[in-house]
Amino acid sequence: PDRRVLFTGDLVFNGGTPFMVMGSVTGSLAALEHLSSFDADVVVPGHGPVCDMTVIERLRRYDEFILDVATRAVNDGVSPLEAARDTDLGEFSELSDSERLVGNLHRALFELAGAEPGAPIDLVAAIGDMVAFNGGKPLTCLA
């Protein structure tokens, strides 16, 4: 604390798409809210280069983006894969591992349907849709 350095572990991805398939979108938002209360000059993320606190706000926007896309998917009656294919990543298009969007939508839709945050989801379906979104190519991870 005296050096104003925040070690975040796997909660923070800098430069890569977060992966919440086995976690929770709402839980991630709560954790990011807590992290934002720290007065740090330096953030050591679990993934990606050392950065500053602006990464926390960027990740919060990403999580809210996921919830917005998932809500539209529910309203439109489309699958996570269809929603992902129809989504412009906008400010998040430069993040690596963009196929994680599909897995994150699986998680968000599951939670919007009433599942407890962090409850197990159908990983085979989520990963299968991620591969399909990735053009049928195997997934890679640079984390």
Provide a role label for each language-model segment:
Residues 2, 9, 15-16, 23, ...:
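Residue-identity detector for glycine
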Residues 40, 75-78, 88:
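Hydrophobic alpha-helix feature that most strongly marks membrane-spanning transmembrane helices
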